């Protein structure tokens, strides 16, 4: 599955997958106490009697738009969200994180806003920020870069291994684009097809943090998939069974981006299309899980799991897309 528009914007997803596969093979030679290695949402290692999950991630080129608009704080929240949302996808309760901020030049207000965002996100996720690193590297960085590394404690692993045909697929609404697809968005802005001034508030909305709702139903679900880079293809990490999804009408910002010049099919390969996290749950528990989650926002009954393989998506335009 090659995202051609994303590739033209400078992000070759196929190359990235090749890098991931190569790196995974090389680093596997270090595994001794590793329970889940590279390739899932988070790595898990056994330390004493504890299963510790660890994940590192950044916010990508959303930082460029943050700097252009001077709307900085949301990317601090994004950085927390991108990490803790991946930790919960292996069954972990996030507990702590450290941050890394790299600057092209000293930018006092930018650093303050980033840290304010990280702290706000950390409080929402109930994690402690226990340190970090700040660097000024004018020969390396353009603007600023931001990443976090988070750890969590796993009581019971959630890898998707228990998913079976007949299970339901639920989706929790996203707050917007979250932190993926921004190289493509920036390309549209640079080409004059999308107005940054008009849509800056939508484009800079922070990623929704799903820790509280997912922890509430963790013992009732079979798996969770954070919809980030690669969009719905990420569901293949959890199961090889066939997944059929009937996607809801997405928020207007996605339609605006599509109208600006992104192919309809491409939208579902790059963006979350209004769904931030996907859950797999048995038929017996589906209604109870859905009811518990409705206090945290809109919950969609997206589809089911079947015998077979691959992912079939019915888009909001009633077109059929196979991943």
From Swiss-Prot:
Hydrolase listed as a keyword: no
GO molecular function, one term: phosphoribosylamine-glycine ligase activity
Coiled-coil regions, chain positions: none
Recorded catalytic activity of this chain's protein: 2-formamido-N(1)-(5-O-phospho-beta-D-ribosyl)acetamidine + ATP = 5-amino-1-(5-phospho-beta-D-ribosyl)imidazole + ADP + phosphate + H(+)
EC number assigned by the record: 6.3.3.1
Xref: Pfam families: AIRS, AIRS_C
Protein name listed in UniProt: Phosphoribosylformylglycinamidine cyclo-ligase
